[in-house]
């Protein structure tokens, strides 16, 4: 933290914003990109920090207030949104210059949070956390993989033709796709870039003719290159800056919710920008017959694993010691019996007794309770399958508690 605050002086800043998200605005970021956890020790899925010269603030929503206070310790003052916003704590008589990394913020969100009279925002292209993060975890690179029409119902070529109609209606020259989940949809590919979601970290630039420039690490495309349309031109991740800079007098559509300030600034110098929600969100939301069948299939598969697990709990909790963490692992093992299972869809909530009342509780060696007679046991979990995603919450009574207790606990979820 001392090194970081020295950088504030070096860059003539009064403070610096550190968000949870990575450059792709993913909810779940890998350890090599979790700058907020590195600086604050907070491991929740949402939040941001403001580091000032003499004080540090950690902003989270109500799900994470207790967790943030425990993990960040005395180094940070935890602020719960929406009870308070940055404008409520940055009330100083003097003007403050607050720095930010333009690749980690959208204009709309930054303006919403920091449209404050005494605050001057300063874009800093070098990420200051990265400068002081010497023992950074290694970034694992795994190749993307393709989904067959059996799982998607519609080929990538058909999806591209559908999106092409959007160009004609809106009279734009290019569509910049910056949301990884939308790239996954249009190209029928998946990846390993997020711990709980099979999204591919990449960017895509499509023109009105259906030609696509695809930007990502070359090591990630080895398994998908042959299966994709020949209209796709593959580029290294960092080549996007050069290609965007060279676009001139074009009408370019971008999503203000997922396009960073950095890329927007590259484009708006020489082009006309149209900022709306990425049309792929709309196309993606209309599920075809195959997708609907696969959704049902994924819940039947997951339901079988969960049913076996709950039966196992009821049968064994009196006979042997079952802790929250052991139960969590056992559920994962039941899911793994299905060959189509990939990995969890989020951090499992496995809580017993008083821990069921903690929002977004995550069992740890320190909090790991044994399941006891008379407890309520709550499990909120999900799985990623090759054909769908699940998210299921169940509360069971371990003996004497009534149905009413279970209803109350489920409502808290």
Model-derived segments and their meaning:
Residues 1-413:
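Active-site neighborhoods and metal-handling regions in enzymes and metal-associated proteins
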């Amino acid at each position: 933290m001392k090194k970081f605050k020295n950088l504030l002086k070096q860059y003539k800043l009064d403070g610096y914003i550190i968000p949870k998200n990575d450059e792709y605005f993913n909810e779940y970021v890998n350890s090599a990109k979790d700058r907020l956890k590195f600086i604050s020790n907070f491991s929740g899925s949402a939040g941001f920090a403001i580091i000032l010269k003499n004080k540090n603030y950690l902003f989270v929503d109500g799900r994470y207030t207790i967790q943030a206070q425990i993990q960040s310790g005395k180094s940070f003052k935890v602020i719960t949104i929406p009870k308070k916003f940055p404008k409520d704590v940055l009330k100083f008589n003097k003007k403050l210059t607050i720095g930010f990394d333009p690749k980690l913020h959208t204009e709309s969100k930054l303006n919403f949070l920091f449209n404050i009279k005494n605050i001057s925002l300063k874009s800093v292209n070098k990420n200051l956390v990265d400068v002081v993060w010497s023992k950074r975890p290694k970034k694992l690179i795994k190749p993307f993989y393709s989904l067959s029409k059996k799982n998607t119902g519609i080929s990538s070529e058909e999806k591209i033709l559908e999106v092409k109609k959007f160009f004609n209606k809106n009279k734009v020259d290019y569509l910049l796709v910056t949301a990884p989940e939308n790239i996954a949809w249009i190209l029928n590919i998946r990846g390993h870039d997020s711990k709980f979601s099979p999204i591919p970290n990449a960017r895509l630039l499509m023109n009105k003719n259906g030609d696509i420039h695809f930007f990502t690490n070359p090591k990630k495309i080895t398994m998908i290159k042959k299966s994709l349309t020949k209209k796709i031109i593959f580029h290294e991740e960092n080549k996007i800056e050069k290609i965007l800079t060279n676009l001139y007098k074009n009408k370019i559509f971008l999503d203000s919710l997922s396009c960073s300030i950095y890329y927007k600034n590259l484009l708006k110098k020489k082009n006309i920008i149209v900022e709306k929600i990425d049309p792929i969100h709309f196309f993606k939301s209309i599920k075809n017959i195959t997708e609907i069948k696969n959704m049902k299939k994924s819940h039947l598969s997951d339901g079988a694993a969960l049913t076996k697990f709950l039966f196992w709990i009821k049968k064994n909790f009196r006979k042997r010691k079952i802790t929250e963490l052991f139960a969590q692992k056992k559920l994962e093992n039941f899911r793994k019996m299905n060959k189509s299972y990939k990995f969890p869809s989020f951090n499992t909530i496995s809580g017993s007794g008083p821990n069921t009342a903690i929002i977004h509780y995550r069992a740890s060696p320190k909090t790991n309770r044994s399941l006891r007679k008379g407890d309520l046991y709550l499990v909120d979990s999900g799985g990623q399958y090759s054909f769908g995603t699940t998210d299921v919450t169940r509360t069971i009574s371990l003996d004497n508690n009534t149905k009413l207790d279970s209803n109350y606990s489920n409502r808290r979820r």
